Amino acid sequence: MAITPTQLLDWKRQQRPIVALTAWDTAIASVLDAAGVEIILVGDSLGMVALGYETTLPVSLDTMIHHTAAVKRGVQRALVVCDLPFLTYQESPAQAMGSAGRVLQETGAQAVKLEGGHPRMVETVARLTEVGIPVMGHVGLTPQSVHQLGYRQQGQDPATAEKILHQAIALAEAGVFAIVLEHIPSELAASITEQLPIPTIGIGAGPQCDGQVLVTADLLGLTVKQPPFAPAYLNLRHTITETVHKFSGEVRQRQFPRRG
């Protein structure tokens, strides 16, 4: 049975940690789903990790729909959440509704994720949730605001910490079913987690969040530059390189294919 946003709320009350990872294709999505991952996020980070862009900004809605549909075809149980990419929801609630509607109708994903917690974004979230579109929030470091905020840790001083807290509370009141807390001090994340009735999903936000999310390529050691808050559990880049070298050597020495 597929996981629902309501189950995540139950797990928050039960203090059961939630596991989330990213996927952009059917193969990886099916592995994550079979391994018991509860949330599979089709993140616009695919622009940087899979498509070679320097930021997430060039990623289009059509690209996200293409990859989310591929992910959903490989998933039976996990909750699939799709990032709405840059400038596909910020203009107005009507624009956001059109983008979110396309995602849900064309991919089968169960929810969308929006970045930011300023008043207009809170209004947009409220409009989406009013019509039954499940929304995941995202505050702290928001990659779509890279040219304004950069990639540094957010919420380090009392004023910005208070701002992030108030944004998280406002988003929860607007109806998000969960919220990503990215690259903020662990004390701030713990405070937000304690005050919100919805699950917090941390990435570089300490261990006290209700769940954790990582970019799967970072987890597996596929990326060239590892984020400071994302330790690699495997050096898959090295493993793939060695495997390709072995295959190449056998081809060049005419040892492949082996005579059976």
From Swiss-Prot:
It comes from the Bacteria. It catalyses: 3-methyl-2-oxobutanoate + (6R)-5,10-methylene-5,6,7,8-tetrahydrofolate + H2O = 2-dehydropantoate + (6S)-5,6,7,8-tetrahydrofolate. The active site is at E182. Keywords: Cytoplasm, Magnesium, Metal-binding, Pantothenate biosynthesis, Transferase. One of its GO terms (biological process) is pantothenate biosynthetic process. Pathway: Cofactor biosynthesis; (R)-pantothenate biosynthesis; (R)-pantoate from 3-methyl-2-oxobutanoate: step 1/2. Binds 1 Mg(2+) ion per subunit. InterPro entries: Pantoate_hydroxy_MeTrfase, Pyrv/PenolPyrv_kinase-like_dom, Pyrv_kinase-like_dom_sf. Its EC number is 2.1.2.11. GO terms for cellular component: cytoplasm. Homodecamer; pentamer of dimers. This is 3-methyl-2-oxobutanoate hydroxymethyltransferase. It comes from Synechocystis sp. (strain ATCC 27184 / PCC 6803 / Kazusa). The gene is panB.
